[in-house]
Every structure is written in structure tokens, then in C-alpha cells.
Amino acid sequence: MLEKLDSLEEKYDELTHLLSQPEVLSDQARFQKLAKAHSALSDIVTMYREYKSLSRQLEDSKEMLVEEEDEEFRQMLADEIPQLQEKKASLEQELRILLLPQDPNDEKSVIMEIRAGTGGEEAALFAGDLFRMYSRYAEEQGWKIEIMDTHYTDIGGIKEIVFVVDGRGAYSKLKFESGVHRVQRIPVTESGGRIHTSAATVAVLPEAEEVEVAIDPNDLRIDVYCSSGPGGQSVNTTQSAVRITHVPTGEVVTCQDEKSQHKNKAKALRVLRARLKELLEEEKNAEMAGTRKNQVGSGDRSERIRTYNFPQGRVSDHRINLTLHRLESVLEGRLEEIINALIAHYQAERLKQVD
């Protein structure tokens, strides 16, 4: 591990030197490329330097403890050494995590899809709750939400919503949200006061760049129609809604939220590109499926990942046996505790495999 860290530190110093050279400063494309590489190494090199400094301090303290005759000073050193050892072990663990191969999609924006599952109108109302939860979380993170397509029910629930969460690192935090989310509560439509169980499915796709997924226009069938609102009534007399079918894969994307057919087509292609990227990555990772299953869920949309229990005011994530008794604040978008716990668990699983 130390050899690898020494090599990264050397590379970082080399990049620092290059970034100050006139020939690099005058070439914006090269400067940006080198600056990005420099920034990517910054955290791990800073931590490694702290680790080396701490290691030297620990060795010095051990030597002084052997040589020192003053009892009071010896006691101070004896108290300090375990603290330094604990901090060194903690930094070593953090460095091991930083050395793990990064998910190339982690820094990307995401396209999220929420669909009401079993439970009729109640499931659609819950899908709306999930969308509000993610919207508030995104707002807290400083990310932007852009709705691509929405289908409402008669009482204002959401049958299906597709939206972009635009912000650096969105995928690294939201990728663990893929799966089935279950709700247990007394529906507003229930007169008998009985608790019902409903579900909604969430899919999280890293946004794909045009250069990553080339789409042949000849592979597309594009249909246009009038957009509709709650209950199916027409809300637009012009044919602005767009349905794109990717014939080779059978993937279908609809978009009707914009008044312009051109804008709806552009949004639908954006979603289609992300779905095709996911299909390509699923094929590529097929051999690794067993490994992924042993980690924090598989990202499988059919996997039940979390339950929101209203009578008990709790949220339970079934992948890591985490239960929080603050349902209301979670639905207000305060997801950081759950997401951080999932990331930590995932990293620990990956470290086990490396070991």
C-alpha cells in the first residue's frame, strides 16, 4: 500500500510542477486535463502526508518513552501513544478506502425513475412522497431537479415520474436508492382505518454522454400525440408529447412535460441514452453479478430495500439492518445518515474482497 501511495504522491508533485509551467498555462485544454488529474489526487495525497507525519510522531514518542527518565513526562508519553496509534489505524483505513477503484459514474448526474407498484392509488401517493423526498434532498445538496415526464392519477398521485438530478457526485450518493420502497400506513382512501402495505419502484441511472452511447436514428421509431394530465384528460391541443421506441432493444421512453415537441424529444433521448448505457453495463457486468449480490443489494429494481412504517414512525433499510425512528425527517429529505451508512457498508464489503 505504501509503495502505491508514494507513487501517487510523486505523480501529484509532478502535476503541481507542470501546472506552473508557461507552456501548460498557455494551453487551456492541457491545463484543464492536468488540473483535473491534480484535483483527483489532492485528497489522498493530503491524507497520506498527514499519515506519514503522524507515523513519525508516533515513532519519536516511542523512542522518547524508552530514553526519558522524568516520570511525569513518561506518563504523558504513555498516554499519548495509544491515541496516536488509534489515529494512525483510522487514517490507514481511510487511505485503503481511497485506494479502492472508483466507480467511473460516481461524479455524474443521474436520471431517476419512480413508478407506483402494488397498492393502487395509495402506491401512487407514496410515489409522490418519494419524489418530494428526493427533491428536498437534492436541494440540500445544492443539486438541481429537472422533470422529464410525469403521469398523474385522478387524486394527484404519481403513476410514474422521470427526472434528472443534476449535480456533481449525485450518482455516488443516489445509486443505492434503486429498488422497491415499501410503505405501511392507513391510506387516505381507507374509511375503516386499516393499515395497508403499498410499494413504489425506484431506478437510478447515471446520465450518459452522447460520446458514451451512440444512437443510430434509423433504430428509432418516434410517435407524437397530445399530452394528458390527471385522469387522462388532454391538456394540450397540439401534438407536443413524444414517444420514442428503440427498436433493437424494445426500450420505450415518453416525454410530455414540455409544450414544445422538440424539447420533449430532446429530453426523451436523454433518458433513452441513460437506459441504453445501463443495458450495456449490465451485459458487461454479468460475470460479476455474484460479487455484486454480496454487496449492498444488487441495484436490482425488484429487490425490496426499504420500508417506511407510518404507525411506528420508523424507516428500515433491509440491506444493512438499519432502523431510524424519524420517518418524518427522512421524508423531508434528510437522507444523509442512511446514505452514509450504505456507502460505509459498501466500502467495507469491497475492502474484504481486496483482502
Swiss-Prot record:
Keyword Protein biosynthesis attached: yes
GO molecular function ontology, one term from the record: translation release factor activity, codon specific
Major location (coarse): cytoplasm
Compartments where located: Cytoplasm
Pfam family, one: PCRF
PTM sites of type N5-methylglutamine: 233
PTM comment text: Methylated by PrmC. Methylation increases the termination efficiency of RF1.
InterPro entries: PCRF, Pep_chain_release_fac_I, Pep_chain_release_fac_I_sf, Prokaryotic/Mito_RF, RF-1
Transferase among keywords: no
Keywords from the UniProt entry: Cytoplasm, Methylation, Protein biosynthesis
Database matches in SMART domains: PCRF (SM00937)
GO cellular component: cytoplasm
Purpose: Peptide chain release factor 1 directs the termination of translation in response to the peptide chain termination codons UAG and UAA.
Family from the record: Belongs to the prokaryotic/mitochondrial release factor family.
Protein name as it appears in the record: Peptide chain release factor 1
Underlying gene: prfA
